Design a protein with these regions (language model features):
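Hydrophobic alpha-helical transmembrane segments that serve as membrane anchors
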Residues: 55-67, 102-105
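Alpha-helical transmembrane segments of integral membrane proteins, especially early/N-terminal helices
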Residues: 6-27, 55-62
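Alpha-helical transmembrane segments
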Residues: 42-59
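Alpha-helical transmembrane segments and their helix-start/interface "positive-inside/aromatic belt" motifs
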Residues: 1-14, 46-50, 88-99
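Non-transmembrane, membrane-proximal soluble domains of secreted or membrane proteins
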Residues: 21-46, 68-293
Length: 293
């Protein structure tokens, strides 16, 4: 291989690296806003994987394209190819590189996993990312919020204040502790803007922690196919300042109790009234009685 060929390959590799790094930065814009401390780590990991994947993809496709266009046999060339039986050095290289890449990806992924301090499925506890927000405010934690899931409605209870709501209110920059339970089937607690997801198993209480860092209204979805109206099992997650959060709790304790919102139950009730029940399905759980609204 002469100097000219080596120079061209180096230039192409540098250009490919630049494009890959650019794609990795663009990957941040493909995701929702970063509304939790955990989202920063997850987005960095996603950007890393996009960068690496772009380099490999265009490197392989570029090599194949060059081979097809410039290394193919002539139109009327019917001669046999060179009798190459193998190349031990090349085979070692293309085996070693993927192994090292997989180890690199696994190591980085484990570092993210470890920094989030996730204990794993045996304990059914996600302790969240203890080091994600290096501030004194992050040391403060809220009392545990009970999250009850049933077909197809979310119910949130703040036991210390005796407040119940169908919307999840959270304070900004404070550790949030949730106690997740399911009354019927497996549900998925998933907030895309927070990059957190936890399956909720019937008959088990699962402790889950994270840190909201951005005020706003986000969507909580059931990420598991839990039945007919699972797509309607959505609600708002409202992140507000600690002062606004405390005011909301205080005002909620003074509100009279009333049935909360349940899109699944409302839709089913309308179908029953109109006589268009359709296929047989489980009757949605009635709206919970709430005072936080």
């Amino acid at each position: 291989m002469n100097i000219r060929t080596i120079s061209i390959l180096v230039i192409l590799a540098i250009a490919l690296a630049v494009v890959s790094l650019w794609m990795g930065q663009q990957a941040y814009t493909w995701l929702p806003v970063q509304a939790s401390a955990e989202s920063q780590l997850i987005d960095d990991l996603f950007s890393f994987l996009v960068t690496l994947g772009t380099f490999i993809f265009f490197g392989v496709v570029g090599t194949l394209t060059y081979s097809v266009l410039f290394q193919r046999a002539g139109k009327y060339d019917n001669s046999d190819g060179p009798p190459i039986e193998g190349n031990v050095k090349l085979e070692i290289i293309w085996t070693t590189i993927p192994i090292l890449l997989v180890i690199w990806i696994a190591g980085y992924s484990y570092q993210v996993y470890d920094r989030m301090s996730i204990l794993g499925p045996m304990e059914h506890v996600h302790r969240g990312m203890a080091m994600a927000v290096e501030s004194e405010s992050n040391k403060n934690t809220t009392p545990s919020i009970e999250v009850h899931s049933r077909q197809w409605v979310w119910e949130f209870r703040y036991p210390e204040q005796n407040v119940t709501s169908t919307e999840l209110h959270l304070p900004k920059d404070r550790r949030v502790k949730l106690a997740l339970t399911s009354d019927d089937v497996i549900h998925g607690f998933y907030i895309p803007a927070f990059r957190v997801k936890q399956d909720i198993i019937p008959g088990q209480k699962i402790d889950f922690e994270f840190t909201p860092i951005r005020e706003g209204t986000y969507r909580l979805r059931d990420s598991q196919y839990s039945g007919t109206y699972f797509s309607a099992m959505q609600t708002n997650v409202i992140v507000e300042s600690p002062e606004s959060y405390e005011n909301w709790l205080t005002n909620a304790t003074k509100q009279p109790s009333k049935p909360g919102d349940s899109p699944a139950f409302s839709e089913y009730s309308q179908l029953v009234k109109s006589g268009r029940v359709g296929w047989k399905t489980i009757v949605p759980a009635p709206p919970p009685i709430i005072n936080g609204y």
